[in-house]
């Protein structure tokens, strides 16, 4: 019988658990340590911290007749509570807790959820989760099992999640399995997810953790986890211990692909991700590796409007014209997400692609781009200037919301002024030079004996109006 099926040594209703939960809730670490080190017996006792199991609470409002096949009860419920025999049941982890929702949310059918919430743990897991090194040492000296995981997570998992290097080291020194999988199929190394967990990761590897171990439903390796979170120092550590730079996860992603597809919110995260990708590329990562959807790292970087990362990938040979299974190019991905990206990032991304030889949008599709990116006129300007001559139609005005038009009136007036006028000679010269240089424009233009303003003009720097 598993620990999950066995009665816990200290059920939720026990006095010790009540005091322990109170101490945990208030952050009373001294009381927590006292309870788990001196009052809980045996040392590997199973403690129940949560249990919403309806079967143990007779007062719960659960229609047991539905589960037990009571026809009369079911008929009564149909008459009183819902009117649709196709009521939706959402089942998660086997729990059976009835949650009534308003008609406004789910209509007349309502929603029945069957959800199980139970948390089992041990004193050692609690001590490791809170970083109580002395408590962990005391429990281990009393022969606590370092691999016990009655709730699906062991003490080493908890230590790594909490970035507690000293606790992780103690557990490993006392025989904790560095590759022990939790209930989600993740090893401790997969749980080193923050910059502060670097020490835990190093301890795990020095104690024999498998650096190439796949884990979880996504079959990510530790290098994938580091890449997804922009942990460049973790990635360097893993590569030093033999991690394969182009290993693929269950979605066909390499670590580079995973890094480019992760959203970076702060400038620090952006910088770490850029360093990580540069590290992977120096280590031999394929800049154009495709995932199961045929998306390259460049597709993903463009989808997040990260011009610095796009430049890095293109310098390492990424294909600016690559198409995914849906027929979308990196440029298309950049345009699709332009209105959601931070200021200046979308047009910089589009500039980078066009200056590295990406084909522009098919002319007939330009009205659609205008409709999608109207709020970002800089993107429209950069893209429009990539054509030698694109006929402007007055009908395009319908694609621009009135408030957007008024907000960016100078630019859109200059756009529609070209409806019956050819582009200026300076623009035509720009297009001729760019056509001559092709995808080498970004390298050759800066070498021309021209003022910086003209070099920027040749590289499609937006000016705010068209001529």
From Swiss-Prot:
ANK repeats lie at residues 15-45, 57-87, 119-148, 151-180, 184-213, 218-247, 251-292, 293-322, 326-362. The keyword tRNA processing does not apply. CDD domains: SOCS_ASB4_ASB18. Residues 406-464 form the SOCS box domain. Keywords: ANK repeat, Repeat, Ubl conjugation pathway. The keyword Membrane does not apply. GO terms for biological process: intracellular signal transduction; protein ubiquitination. Pfam families: Ank (PF00023), Ank_2 (PF12796), Ank_3 (PF13606), SOCS_box (PF07525). SMART domains: ANK, SOCS, SOCS_box. Pathway: Protein modification; protein ubiquitination. Belongs to the ankyrin SOCS box (ASB) family. May be a substrate-recognition component of a SCF-like ECS (Elongin-Cullin-SOCS-box protein) E3 ubiquitin-protein ligase complex which mediates the ubiquitination and subsequent proteasomal degradation of target proteins. The SOCS box domain mediates the interaction with the Elongin BC complex, an adapter module in different E3 ubiquitin-protein ligase complexes. This is Ankyrin repeat and SOCS box protein 18. It comes from Mus musculus. The gene is Asb18.
């Amino acid at each position: 019988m598993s620990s999950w099926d066995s009665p816990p040594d200290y059920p939720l209703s026990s006095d010790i658990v009540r005091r322990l939960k109170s101490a945990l809730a208030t952050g009373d670490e001294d009381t927590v340590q006292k309870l788990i080190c001196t009052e809980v017996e045996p040392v590997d006792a199973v403690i129940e911290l949560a249990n919403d199991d309806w079967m143990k609470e007779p007062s719960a409002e659960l229609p047991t007749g539905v589960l037990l096949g009571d026809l009369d009860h079911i008929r009564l419920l149909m008459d009183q509570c819902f009117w649709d025999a196709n009521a939706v049941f959402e089942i998660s982890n086997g729990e059976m807790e009835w949650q009534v929702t308003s008609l406004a949310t789910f209509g007349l059918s309502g929603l029945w959820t069957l959800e199980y919430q139970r948390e089992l743990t041990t004193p050692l897991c609690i001590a490791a989760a809170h970083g109580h090194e002395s408590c962990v040492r005391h429990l281990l000296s009393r022969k606590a099992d370092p691999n016990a995981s009655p709730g699906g997570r062991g003490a080493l998992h908890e230590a790594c999640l909490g970035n507690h290097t000293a606790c992780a080291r103690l557990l490993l020194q006392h025989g904790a399995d560095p590759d022990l999988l939790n209930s989600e199929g993740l090893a401790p190394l997969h749980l080193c997810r923050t910059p502060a967990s670097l020490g835990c990761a190093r301890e795990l590897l020095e104690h024999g953790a498998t650096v190439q171990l796949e884990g979880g439903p996504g079959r990510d390796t530790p290098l994938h986890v580091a890449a997804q979170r922009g942990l460049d120092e973790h990635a360097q550590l893993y590569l030093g211990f033999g991690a394969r730079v182009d290993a693929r996860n269950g979605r066909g992603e390499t670590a580079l692909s995973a890094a480019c597809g992760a959203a970076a919110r702060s400038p620090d995260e952006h910088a770490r991700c850029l360093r990580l990708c540069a590290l992977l590329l120096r280590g031999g990562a394929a800049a154009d590796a495709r995932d199961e959807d045929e998306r390259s790292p460049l597709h993903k970087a463009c989808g997040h409007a990260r011009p610095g990362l796009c430049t890095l990938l293109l310098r390492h040979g990424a294909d600016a014209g690559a198409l995914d299974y849906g027929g979308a190019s990196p440029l298309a991905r950049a345009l699709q997400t332009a209105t959601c990206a931070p200021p200046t990032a979308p047009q910089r991304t589009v500039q980078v692609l066009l200056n590295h030889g990406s084909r522009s949008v098919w002319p007939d599709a330009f009205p659609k781009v205008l409709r999608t990116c109207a709020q970002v006129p800089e993107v429209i300007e950069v893209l429009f200037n990539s054509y030698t001559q694109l006929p402007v139609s007055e009908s395009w005005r319908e694609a621009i919301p009135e408030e957007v038009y008024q907000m960016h009136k100078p630019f859109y007036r200059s756009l529609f002024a070209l409806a019956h006028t050819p582009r200026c000679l300076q623009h035509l010269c720009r297009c001729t030079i760019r056509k001559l240089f092709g995808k080498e424009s970004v390298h050759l233009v800066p070498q021309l004996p021209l003022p910086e303003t003209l070099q920027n003009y040749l590289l499609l720097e937006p000016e705010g109006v068209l001529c």
